[in-house]
Swiss-Prot record:
It comes from Mus musculus. This is Multifunctional methyltransferase subunit TRM112-like protein. GO terms for molecular function: protein heterodimerization activity; protein methyltransferase activity; tRNA methyltransferase activator activity. GO terms for biological process: peptidyl-glutamine methylation; positive regulation of rRNA processing; rRNA (guanine-N7)-methylation; rRNA methylation; transcription initiation-coupled chromatin remodeling; tRNA methylation. Signal peptide: none annotated. Keywords: Cytoplasm, Nucleus. It holds the Pfam family Trm112p.
């Protein structure tokens, strides 16, 4: 699971609502998978990223590259875009869990795929 994906996921356990984001990341296996650098794509994604959640996830994985906020004029800052490309697209969580901050529900990550399926009693009716 890429950190870009993590930044888009939230818990939909009954009664949680918007308090199901960001999911707490606990990784037991992480791999770096090189991906071709596309500065235009990264620049388009930066405004869509929930920055505090990205910083929290990066801190959990001991990734020091993530600044506390995007740099001014990041669209033209290749160094910044390369760092964010690495963090968002090349860091791959293969095994671990995601935890709902409100309910505490754990969602497993297996072979890079987060399982967000809920039991019937956990869903809204």
């Amino acid at each position: 699971m890429k950190l870009l994906t993590h930044n888009l996921l939230s818990s939909h356990v009954r009664g949680v609502g918007t308090r199901g984001f960001p999911l707490r990341l606990q990784a037991t296996e992480v791999r770096i998978n090189p991906v071709e650098f596309n500065p235009e794509f990264v620049a388009r994604m930066i405004p869509k990223v929930e920055w505090a959640a990205l910083v929290q996830a990066a801190d959990t994985l001991n990734l020091a590259e993530v600044p506390k906020e995007p740099t001014e004029g990041y669209e033209h800052d290749e160094t910044f875009l390369r760092k964010m490309h690495h963090v968002l697209l090349e860091v791959d969580v293969l095994e671990g869990t995601l935890q709902c901050p409100e309910s505490g529900r754990l969602f497993p990550i297996s072979r890079g795929i987060p399982n967000m399926l809920l039991n019937d009693e956990e869903t809204e009716t």
